[in-house]
């Protein structure tokens, strides 16, 4: 399993939301680039960036910053949030971003998703953001009738290699991840699963590692200092 430290971006600043609520925004560091570099210095193998402006409105105002990070660090960077056209996918991947995470567009435009996978294969991941078993889109602002298990199976059938699963009700809470939800998903699909939302401490990292997931994304726990990133990385590498 790999650990992906997360940086959520609003107006070029590193922030955290509580349960995806844009009104519960907290700036967690001074500078996005320096935060990303510090994660690399601590031994991170991959960095997870979320463009919250993009997720909410589809804007690309943070893309220049993301590309700078992708090109100046020595580790791969993935980006999610507001990526809703093939042109944007191409622009980001052609300019150094290692993987893009599609959310809303994966729900709304199957043909675009298939085209992106045909060309970029594993550089395309799909974010499955859910609450009470239902998938959400538009920066977690829009509920759908899609069941998260059925949606994950559909993504696997389309050819998606990697899904990032977030329990919105856990995000930013430090209450621990939704382990049962992740176990159920792991039993159902054979593609790579990255868990996001709720991680608090090293015990949570051990729990997720025991499920044999591809990755675990953690943000707030690092900023709140309830989790040592170096220790989490060390545990994630055991037995690799």
Curated annotation (Swiss-Prot):
Enzyme Commission no:
5.3.1.16
Which GO terms of type biological process are on file?
A: L-histidine biosynthetic process; L-tryptophan biosynthetic process
Single GO MF annotation = 1-(5-phosphoribosyl)-5-[(5-phosphoribosylamino)methylideneamino]imidazole-4-carboxamide isomerase activity
Reactions performed catalytically:
1-(5-phospho-beta-D-ribosyl)-5-[(5-phospho-beta-D-ribosylamino)methylideneamino]imidazole-4-carboxamide = 5-[(5-phospho-1-deoxy-D-ribulos-1-ylimino)methylamino]-1-(5-phospho-beta-D-ribosyl)imidazole-4-carboxamide
The question of whether Repressor is a record keyword is answered with no
Any one Pfam family match given in the protein's UniProt record, by short name: His_biosynth
**What domain of life does the native source organism fall in?**
Bacteria
Localisation per UniProt entry: Cytoplasm
Q: Where is the active site?
A: 8 (proton acceptor), 129 (proton donor)
Q: Supply the alphabetized keyword list.
A: Amino-acid biosynthesis, Cytoplasm, Histidine biosynthesis, Isomerase
Give the metabolic or biological pathway.
Amino-acid biosynthesis; L-histidine biosynthesis; L-histidine from 5-phospho-alpha-D-ribose 1-diphosphate: step 4/9
Q: Which GO terms describe its cellular component?
A: cytoplasm
Q: Which family does it belong to?
A: Belongs to the HisA/HisF family.
Q: Which HAMAP family match?
A: HisA
Q: What is this protein called?
A: 1-(5-phosphoribosyl)-5-[(5-phosphoribosylamino)methylideneamino] imidazole-4-carboxamide isomerase
The gene name reads hisA
